[in-house]
Design a protein with these regions (language model features):
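Phosphate/diphosphate-binding loops
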Residues: 111, 129, 134-137, 149-151, ...
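Short beta-alpha connecting loops at secondary-structure transitions
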Residues: 101-105, 169-179, 212-217, 255-260, ...
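Catalytic alpha/beta active-site cores
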Residues: 1-258, 263-264, 282, 289-296, ...
Length: 526
């Protein structure tokens, strides 16, 4: 019986040579590390070294998160990934009334360079690669990181890492936007230019499908809308006067890995192929690195369950295997208790150990792109590619990603997909072990990690001391220069860095930009 994939595409019970009738390997695949990069962006992939194990972490104060990072490094992680709390993500200080009840809850609270200094205390920034999941205020957190690097004596050209910096997906699926699309895109172009000149090894954006997938997007929708956003960013940078080969090699992407391994592998391979063609054929990129879709993967949090949480260990292992078979460059494996609360030390360690078992106790790293030539995976790769291209064409016909966002297209498509998933789960058609089948009459008790509510008062106290100690006139002068740059065409990151060095807070810097650029109010389109 034919099954339907997550993207609504057919999966036949048996595949044979006829599934690839007229299929040409040299056109569809090429060699690993060569156009169209279907088989991976590097010739040797994991046969030379494994992917980067980059575990996402951050909670409470900078002191607590710093301890967690040091523990992860001691356990063998090769890269850090910083989670920020909602006030930081929205550009508010911890003592702002709107931040009440949210400080340090879903990530670490960062209000100023003082907090950033503590967050990376004892961690040499020239020895570690750091990813920061931050979007609307991405420029601020990047500059705070650079300032801490300067204090450590680390040259900016030795700093490596990534800022997510993908505001378009915030309008589609997540909601942590601040400014309207036009100034947001201007800010992203300023970041591209600044990093080209000042922090050349930094990945300036991580164009993200993960959050769309968590909101309900199918695999085809995930890569279609993500790549459409990527096209918008490339056009923005080119319109700002940049040569495509000057910034495209530092673009990166971020996708989800579900338990449906075959379609996930097909999705990753299709995404690489589409992006390579777009960059070469539409934008005329000639640097091979400009054509490479390099991506980070996180296992699907939306598939984790609060019921029988230990079963999530199995789900995460399966999801991680799919990411590796699909050729990810780095991977975060979720902790089994994340459907309940922030990970404990033990669950975070088990999540990292899951990756280490995949890398060192299996043979998936022994050969490049193990599914190459598989009838089912090659057919599914072609099918996912075709479905994604159809959606991308619809976005183009609306005038690009921003116009489609204003019309509510991507959001409504994702909501329809999410509704279908919910219906199938409620009816039992979609089996979720421990939820709608194989349930326990009584769940075992589980004690989650809890964030101390006193953290909010602690952060407010730190802010009060900072404001009492700093040179307020220097802060005011720097913020005035920032407003002038925002009103004009100068790159805002240079005066922004001066303000942050003078110990202006994240909220103060964002408020200065709000005064000039305003804030985004979503349409009521559904």
């Amino acid at each position: 019986m034919t099954r339907e994939s997550e993207s609504g595409l057919p999966i036949e019970p048996v595949y044979g040579p006829d599934a690839l009738d007229g299929w040409r390997a040299e056109e569809k695949l090429g060699e690993p590390g060569a156009y169209p990069f279907t088989r991976g962006v590097y010739p040797s992939m994991y046969t030379g070294r494994p992917w980067t194990m980059r575990q996402y972490a951050g909670f409470g104060t900078a002191t607590e998160s710093n301890a967690r990072y040091k523990q992860l490094i001691a356990n063998g992680t090769a890269g850090l990934s910083v989670a920020f709390d909602l006030p930081t993500q929205m550009g508010h200080d911890s003592d702002a009334p709107i931040a009440s009840g949210e400080v340090g809850k879903v990530g670490v609270a960062i209000d100023s360079v003082d907090d950033m200094r503590v967050l990376f205390g004892g961690i040499p920034l020239d020895k570690v690669s750091t990813s920061m999941t931050i979007n609307a205020p991405a420029a601020l957190l990047l500059l705070l990181y650079q300032l801490v690097g300067e204090e450590q004596g680390v040259p900016a050209d030795k700093l490596t890492g990534t800022i997510q910096n993908d505001v378009l997906k915030e309008y589609i699926a997540r909601g942590t936007y601040i400014f309207p699309p036009k100034p947001s895109l201007r800010l992203i172009a300023d970041i591209f230019k600044y990093c080209k000149a000042e922090i050349p090894k930094w990945n300036t954006i991580s164009i993200s499908g993960y959050h769309m997938a968590e909101a309900g997007a199918s695999p085809a929708q995930e890569i279609a809308f993500t790549l459409a956003d990527g096209i918008e960013y490339v056009r923005t940078a080119v319109a700002a006067g940049m040569d495509v080969d000057d910034f495209a090699p530092r673009l990166s992407f971020f996708f989800v890995a579900r338990t449906t391994i075959l379609e996930e592998v097909a999705k990753f391979r299709a995404a690489r192929r589409i992006w390579a063609k777009v960059m070469r054929e539409e934008f005329g990129a000639t640097n091979p690195k400009s054509l490479m879709l390099r991506f980070h993967t996180q296992t699907a949090g939306v598939q984790l369950t609060a019921q029988q949480p230990e079963v999530n260990l199995v789900r995460v292992a399966v999801q991680g295997l799919g990411a590796v078979l699909g050729g990810t460059q780095s991977l975060h494996t979720n902790s089994f208790d994340e459907a309940i609360a922030l990970p404990t030390d033990k669950s975070a360690r088990l999540a990292l150990r899951t990756q280490q078992v995949l890398a060192y106790e299996t043979d998936v790293t022994a050969t490049v792109d193990p599914f190459a030539g598989s009838y089912v995976v090659e057919k599914m790769t072609d099918d996912v590619e075709a479905a994604a291209l159809e959606l991308m064409l619809k976005v183009e016909e609306m005038g690009g990603a921003v116009n489609a966002i204003e019309r509510g297209f991507q959001k409504s498509e994702i909501e329809r997909s999410a509704y279908r998933i919910a219906q199938e789960t409620d009816s039992g058609e979609r089996v979720v072990v421990g939820v709608n089948r194989f349930r326990l009459d009584e769940e075992e008790p589980y004690e989650p990690l809890r964030v101390d509510p006193a953290i909010e008062a602690q952060q407010a106290g730190r802010l009060a001391r900072l404001r009492a100690e700093r040179d307020q006139r220097a802060v005011d002068a720097a913020l005035t220069e920032l407003r002038k740059a925002a009103e004009g065409t100068d790159n805002v990151l240079y005066p922004m860095k001066d303000a942050l060095r003078a110990r202006a807070t994240v909220g103060e810097v964002c408020n200065a930009l709000r005064e000039v650029w305003g804030t985004y109010v979503p349409s009521d389109v559904f």
